[in-house]
């Protein structure tokens, strides 16, 4: 059973995240909404949680904006202390690897990709957080791959 954080808005009609629910329904994946302490998606009884981000702008805000950073880091620490492996899945067309992140630059905050990559490495080393990338079309498949195989 896939657990979906009840703060995720992807079940609302017309929502830009409808593709995730459609993927699960098409593939017969059972899911239930409930409040998750860590991440947005988790298998019942599993030790991996996926925290989906809409793109590098969102994760850069989580890592560099004071208010967002505190909330995000609290979640990272909760996962680490609970023994849950946190995987941040960044959904953005054209971003497939760390080299793409390094070349990126925020249009809103001026954060460079190189700085963002440094922040990501720090979380990987300190807390075991893993960062993965996908586009919109493959997001549902990647969430399930990560949760079922750990890859």
Stretch-by-stretch model annotation:
Residues 47-58:
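Active-site ExK catalytic segment of metal-dependent nucleases
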Residues 1-45, 59-151:
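Non-catalytic C-terminal interaction segments of nucleic acid-processing enzymes
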